[in-house]
UniProtKB/Swiss-Prot annotation:
Pfam families documented for this protein: PRY (PF13765), SPRY (PF00622), V-set (PF07686)
Record-annotated membrane-spanning stretches: 156-176
Keywords per UniProt: Blood group antigen, Cell membrane, Cytoplasm, Disulfide bond, Glycoprotein, Immunoglobulin domain, Membrane, Phosphoprotein, Signal, Transmembrane, Transmembrane helix
PROSITE patterns xref list: B302_SPRY, IG_LIKE
Biological source species: Homo sapiens
Record's subcellular location: Cell membrane; Cytoplasm
Gene3D superfamilies: 2.60.120.920, Immunoglobulins
Name of the protein described by the UniProt record: Erythroid membrane-associated protein
Cross-referenced SUPFAM superfamilies: Concanavalin A-like lectins/glucanases, Immunoglobulin
Glycosylated sites: N132
Membrane-side (Cytoplasmic) residue stretches: 177-475
Lineage: Eukaryota, Metazoa, Chordata, Craniata, Vertebrata
């Protein structure tokens, strides 16, 4: 028995080296070749063949598959000991996912890893123990994504179309968003523009309202000033008469030298230097060299007339151009409701209400000649000039205008107060430039105006003293 036991021990001692001798030879024959590298698909099964091979029929005492390197934690992926798999000390991520496959005839040991993950990629050590001897070697696992060829055509189409579709949807959404933003921006700009226009309109409307209000106020003040100026001008009323020695030969004067009209033919009158021989005009008898003077001329329904003031030195012979530069400050009604101030150039205008009686005011020191519409108590026009030398009233009844302008010009002997017509009386004899008599119907004349003293005394006590020393204003 002892001999048999010793013989068995000796045989065992000889077989173990032989087993590992084959293992060593196998390893040396495959060291560094491509068999140590294994590739597995993601989600598939990896089969890691241990480079160490055993003699056929040999049952290893222990087989360990370890991850290398994994410091400070268990490295065991799979453990086979004493003929069965062991679960202790295994890495948690590999539990239930490994299978050890032994081929006794080939003497090979293979580790299968199920449901391969990306983190399974790396080095693995295969350790085999037979008896008291153990050997180990290393293999490397590479994890690859599934190839397109392994996918179904529908999956491939979906994989291609889906990203493109998502991209198109994103592009469409981006374009829609940009269009919406552009519309919102345009709408905002339009709203802003409308707001600005409304704001500007409101501002302009406010400015226009203020301007109109200011103009109305100014017009009211001007009307009040003109009315006040006309009323104060009337305080300087003078009774003007006509000078027959200056009358054109075709003019016919009344007996009281206050009415003049155009005759049909020239009258036999002396040709003196003071007489107009071309311009059908006549001057007043008064000479003004200082102070304020006001007179009124009734024009009635005449269609043409010229009234005003001229210098004593104006030319009486031949054609004369009436202008302030030549010593004329005249106002003319040319036709209908058209009026002209004979400035240089002429100033044309229309009046809201044609005057039936015209008031003329002269302030010599102030250099002012103003015309007033006595009918509605409004101002018509004002000349300004630095006067020198005597000034005289000027009258021109103008041509007959087809029979529409035959009425005379009548100088009011008193202030005109109403719209009564002043017409020549049929009785009596008339005379040319003093020879033909024209009398005025006294019943048609306006009533006699009260004296200036009576006007002042009728005013309130606080205004009387001030008006007694009042002079006409400068315009």
């Amino acid at each position: 028995m002892e001999m048999a036991s010793s013989a068995g021990s000796w045989l065992s001692g000889c077989l173990i080296p032989l087993v590992f001798l084959r293992l060593s030879v196998h390893v040396s024959g495959h060291a560094g070749d491509a068999g140590k590298f294994h590739v597995a698909l993601l989600g598939g099964t990896a089969e890691l063949l241990c480079p160490l091979s055993l003699w056929p029929g040999t049952v290893p005492k222990e087989v360990r598959w370890l991850r290398s390197p994994f410091p400070q934690r268990s490295q065991a992926v799979h453990i086979f000991r004493d003929g069965k798999d062991q679960d202790e000390d295994l890495m948690p991520e590999y539990k239930g996912r490994t299978v050890l496959v032994r081929d006794a005839q080939e003497g090979s040991v293979t580790l299968q890893i199920l449901d391969v993950r990306l983190e399974d990629q790396g080095s693995y050590r295969c350790l085999i123990q037979v008896g008291n001897l153990s050997k180990e070697d290393t293999v490397i696992l590479q994890v690859a994504a599934p190839s397109v060829g392994s996918l179904s055509p529908s999956a491939v189409a979906l994989a291609v179309i889906l990203p493109v579709l998502v991209l198109l949807i994103m592009v469409c959404l981006c374009l829609i968003w940009k269009q919406r933003r552009a519309k919102e921006k345009l709408l905002y700009e339009h709203v802003t523009e409308v707001d600005n226009l409304l704001s500007d309109h409101a501002k302009e409307k406010g400015k226009l309202h203020k301007a109109v209000k200011k103009l109305r106020s100014e017009l009211k003040l001007k009307r009040a000033a003109a009315n006040s100026g006309w009323r104060r001008a009337r305080l300087h009323f003078v009774a003007v008469t006509l000078d027959p020695d200056t009358a054109h030969p075709k003019l016919i004067l009344s007996e009281d030298q206050r009415c003049v009209r155009l005759g049909d033919r020239r009258q036999p009158v002396p040709d003196n230097p003071q007489r107009f021989d071309f311009v059908v005009s006549i001057l007043g008898s008064e000479y003004f060299t200082t102070g304020c003077h006001y007179w009124e001329v009734y024009v009635g329904d005449k269609t043409k007339w010229i009234l005003g003031v001229c210098s004593e030195s104006v030319s009486r012979k031949g054609k004369v151009t009436a202008s302030p530069a030549n010593g004329h400050w005249l106002l003319r009604q040319s036709r209908g409701n058209e009026y002209e101030a004979l400035t240089s150039p002429q100033t044309s205008f229309r009046l809201k209400e044609p005057p039936r009686c015209v008031g003329i005011f002269l302030d010599y020191e102030a250099g002012v000649i103003s015309f007033y519409n006595v009918t509605n108590k409004s101002h018509i026009f004002t000349f300004t000039h630095n006067f020198s030398g005597p000034l005289r009233p000027f009258f021109e009844p103008c041509l007959h205008d087809g029979g529409k302008n035959t009425a005379p010009l009548v100088i009011c002997s008193e202030l005109h107060k109403s719209e009564e017509s002043i017409v020549p009386r049929p009785e009596g004899k008339g005379h040319a430039n003093g020879d033909v008599s024209l009398k005025v119907n006294s019943s048609l004349l306006p009533p006699k105006a009260p004296e200036l003293k009576d006007i002042i005394l009728s005013l309130p006590p606080d205004l009387g003293p001030a008006l007694q020393e009042l002079k006409a204003p400068s315009f």
